[in-house]
């Protein structure tokens, strides 16, 4: 899943009409009942590290493992994972083409008008990739600006370019690459000092850079919002809006999975860190009403 892909308001509102007009079996009988008797379908978008086709042809990913760990204690042992385009996930759930969204999806107030959400599973922000040992001690955009000579790599047209500018990094110290792998190569060749991308991309780059002297800069200070608090996006599962019993049961199992430590263990298998866990008291309702 690429959570930052926008879904147009017209598409969202159009889906809302579908939601009101189309009621699948799952919406009538409830997903708990349907899941236990028939199994469920969870739409995915074939994107790493969330839910994707592995080298053996099986669908794997952090979201797939977490989903099964939530559903199995509820007596739901069969889950089919149809692949669709990312932009078709919300309309597909609204139209009843599948029972829930198994790919991680940013909680977005516009989408909240159309679908329900689980409570957040992970959070996403920016991240730095640096040379091993982080020789320049770069843990924030402010650190790069204060250094004055550190060269930061990112992609043209991305939010990261504006964030670098807003943080006081001079244009001459921002080096743009069309592909994240090109930015990684520049870091490895000492042509830049730090690579700045959303954390999911940094996690992917780390896997590609395995065996080379680069690392993720931790801790990392996120850019502040208007209230001076760190800016985060929150991933969750998309659930049917008109099935509160299922949403409650899903969230209860998610909370148990987190409290046991098993949620973090699954995430760590895919390159996540504890930094990607949202605060336990952040809820979908809060994010929908912000």
Where do the model's predicted regions map?
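Periplasmic-binding protein-like
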Residues: 45, 123-127, 210-251, 274-290
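Extended ligand-binding regions for polar small-molecule ligands
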Residues: 61-74, 134-135, 150-151, 158, ...
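Acidic, polar ligand-binding/catalytic clefts
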Residues: 68, 79-144, 220-226
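Extracytoplasmic small-molecule ligand-binding "clamshell" domains
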Residues: 30-104, 113
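Bilobed "Venus flytrap"/periplasmic-binding protein-like clamshell domains
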Residues: 41, 46-49, 59-72, 127-179, ...
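Alpha-to-beta junction loops
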Residues: 41, 76-78, 95-103, 148-151, ...
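A ligand-binding cleft/hinge motif common to bilobed small-molecule-binding domains
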Residues: 88, 104-113, 163-166, 193-231
């Amino acid at each position: 899943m690429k959570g930052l892909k926008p879904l147009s308001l017209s598409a969202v509102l159009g889906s809302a009409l579908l939601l009101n007009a189309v009621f699948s079996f799952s919406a009538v009988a409830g997903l708990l009942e349907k899941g236990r008797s028939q199994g469920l379908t969870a739409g995915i978008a074939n994107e790493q590290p969330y839910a994707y086709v592995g080298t053996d042809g099986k669908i794997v990913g952090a979201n797939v493992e977490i989903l099964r760990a939530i559903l199995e204690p509820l007596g739901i042992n069969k889950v089919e994972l149809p692949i669709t385009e990312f932009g078709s996930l919300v309309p597909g759930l609204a139209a009843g083409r599948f029972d829930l969204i198994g790919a991680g999806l940013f909680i977005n107030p516009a989408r909240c008008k159309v679908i329900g959400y689980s409570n957040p599973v992970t959070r996403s922000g920016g991240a730095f990739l640096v040379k091993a040992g982080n020789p320049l001690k770069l843990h924030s955009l402010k650190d790069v600006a204060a250094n004055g000579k550190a060269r930061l790599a990112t992609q043209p047209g991305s939010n990261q370019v504006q964030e670098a500018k807003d943080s006081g990094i001079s244009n001459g110290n921002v080096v743009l690459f069309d592909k994240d792998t090109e930015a990684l190569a520049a870091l490895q060749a000492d042509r830049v000092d730090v690579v700045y991308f959303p954390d999911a991309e940094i996690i992917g780059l780390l896997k590609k850079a395995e065996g080379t002297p680069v690392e993720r800069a931790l801790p990392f200070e996120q850019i502040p919002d208007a209230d001076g608090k760190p800016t985060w996006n929150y991933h969750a599962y998309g659930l049917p809006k008109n099935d509160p019993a299922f949403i409650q049961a899903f969230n209860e199992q998610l909370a148990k999975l987190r409290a046991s430590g098993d949620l973090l263990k699954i995430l760590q298998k895919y390159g996540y860190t504890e930094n990607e866990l949202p605060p336990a008291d952040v809820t979908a309702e809060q994010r929908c009403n912000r």
